[in-house]
From Swiss-Prot:
InterPro entries noted in UniProt: LIMS1/2-like_LIM1 (IPR047944), PINCH-1-4-like (IPR017351), PINCH-1/2-like (IPR047946), Znf_LIM (IPR001781)
UniProt lineage: Eukaryota, Metazoa, Chordata, Craniata, Vertebrata
Gene source species: Bos taurus
Subcellular locations according to the entry: Cell junction, Focal adhesion; Cell membrane
Name recorded for this polypeptide: LIM and senescent cell antigen-like-containing domain protein 2
Superkingdom, taxonomy of origin: Eukaryota
Biological process annotations from GO: cell-cell adhesion; cell-cell junction organization; positive regulation of integrin-mediated signaling pathway; positive regulation of substrate adhesion-dependent cell spreading
SMART domains, per the entry: LIM (SM00132)
Residue stretches making up the LIM zinc-binding domain: 13-74, 76-133, 138-195, 196-255, 256-315
Length: 341
């Protein structure tokens, strides 16, 4: 277009907003082929010039950034800021793509997809883990699906057994597979190697072996049946196929002192069908220390030293003597009553 033709075109042109013509020397704003007086090129909402010439167009009308956000831009459900550009609509809310993340592992979900789980938006691996946790099952660390049957444990992680083959024979593995030096073997191949199996975890023992209770154990897995603390070479006590530390063996199976009611550790004084700690066995009247070498008398099912007994009233001593003789006769074996002819 020549200069004269352009001048003629501008002389006939009108402002897009006010529809008035332009003065010959007037500055004109051209926005995508639309012409405006400079003072007419303003926000359709606040009627102010666009800061730095930046505007947003919606349904043929132009808005400054602030008014466009207030009128049309959704707020992000995570950061609360207005969203300009791509909007993720999910969980009855709007999100920036970078703000829509898995609520457990924080991975971005915009391009991965998500699964709704108990009101939460989760990535699929986290959803599978939560689902498995609710069912009391494991998640396979290779395919990230729930393991419905028995898992194969490898390097402390759970897997579907059919993801692996025996290192020696190449057969597909089952949950009975064994790990040895970082490799997996089927049970027959593993047994041929003669490696001891821990009686607790059922896994191979590659280091020190504890032989006890007719089984073999990892050192850290041979523990007290009560407190579950490893013995680590300390003495253990066996009862009905189980091992106990000294403290809990005494608590469960040891003698309890008649006086202090504590489990007796060390020597036991047995008398009057009861048990005492050595330092607790004393006269029930004067509390003087007794031993089995001392003479004592039973009174009210308790020991009384000879000195205190001598102070008892005469009638009481006679009654005690009679009771003692009666108890002695009852303790003697009865004769059959038959006599030879």
């Amino acid at each position: 277009m020549t200069g004269s033709n352009m001048s003629n075109a501008l002389a006939n042109a009108v402002c897009q907003r006010c529809q008035a013509r332009f003065a010959p020397a007037e500055r004109i704003v051209n926005s995508n082929g639309e012409l405006y007086h400079e003072h007419c090129f303003v926000c359709a909402q606040c009627f102010r010039p666009f800061p730095e010439g930046l505007f947003y167009e919606f349904e043929g009308r132009k808005y400054c950034e602030h008014d466009f956000q207030m009128l049309f831009a959704p707020c992000c459900g995570s950061c609360g800021e207005f969203i300009i550009g791509r909007v993720i609509k999910a969980m009855n809310n709007n999100w920036h793509p970078g703000c829509f993340r898995c609520e457990l592992c924080d991975v971005e979900l915009a391009d991965l997809g998500f699964v709704k789980n108990a009101g939460r938006h989760l990535c699929r691996p986290c959803h599978n883990r939560e689902k498995a946790k609710g069912l009391g099952k494991y998640i396979c660390q290779r395919c990230h699906l729930v393991i419905d049957e028995q898992p194969l444990m490898f390097k402390n992680d759970a897997y579907h057994p059919d993801h692996f083959s025996c290192t020696h024979c190449g057969k597909e593995l089952t949950a009975e597979a064994r790990e040895l030096k970082g490799e997996l073997y089927c049970l027959p191949c593993h047994d041929k190697m003669g490696v001891p199996i821990c009686g607790a975890c059922r896994r191979p023992i590659e280091g020190r072996v504890v032989n006890a209770l007719g089984k073999q154990w990892h050192v850290e897995h041979f523990v007290c049946a009560k407190c579950e603390k490893p013995f680590l070479g300390h003495r253990h006590y066996e009862k009905k196929g189980l091992a106990y530390c000294e403290t809990h063996y005494n608590q469960l199976f040891g003698d309890v002192c008649y006086t202090c009611s504590h489990v007796i550790e060390g020597d036991v004084v047995s008398a009057l069908n009861k048990a005492w700690c050595v330092h607790c066995f004393s006269c029930s009247t004067c509390n003087s220390r007794l031993t089995l070498k001392n003479k004592f008398v039973e009174f009210d099912m308790k020991p009384v030293c000879k000195r205190c007994y001598e102070k008892f009233p005469l009638e009481l001593k006679k009654r005690l003597k009679k009771l003692s003789e009666l108890a002695a006769r009852r303790a003697q074996p009865k004769s059959s009553g038959l006599h030879p002819a």
